Amino acid sequence: AVYLLVCKKHGERKMKYKLLAADMDATALNSKKELTPANVNAMEKAIAQGKTVVFSTGRSISLVKPYIDMVRGMRYAVTGSGASVIDTQTGKKFLYETIDPETVKYIAARAAGYVMPIFFIDDKTYSSAWCVDNCADFGLSAYEPIYRKGMNIVDDAFAMFMADPKPVEK
């Protein structure tokens, strides 16, 4: 985690690691979902020392890319809770695991009306407008600006998927 690089109590640590994988929420990002200058500096310092630094997150690449662009030299991302490993500079996917459309249709048919639908399809994130408009009802107020900036907001995400089912990353 990033805190190993900027720990105030112990100072900078000398570790023989080659990869730093940082979770985003409550690790690399503060409570306002911002990437702090201290963490950007720590990540860039590690990259300058020849380390590979990646975000490892449950988010899709469309919701991670703005943060990656803030860290000079960050190239890779582990997204969708491990469903995808992407070279963000070339778009090459080293790993891309999806859930087949029939399984997603089965789940979606039973979940409609009970959950906030968020579909990760082809590196894009989709959700229903009513969900994004009511993020607070889901305990996700802090995410609303991120969703509005990085999601494809549609009238009804379940209906969109059912009309044109595709493999889903998450």
List each language-model region with its residue ranges:
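Short, Lys/Arg-enriched N-terminal segments with co-localized hydrophobic residues
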Residues: 1-14
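Asp-based phosphoryl-transfer active-site loop
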Residues: 17-32
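Active-site phosphate-binding/coordination module
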Residues: 37-141
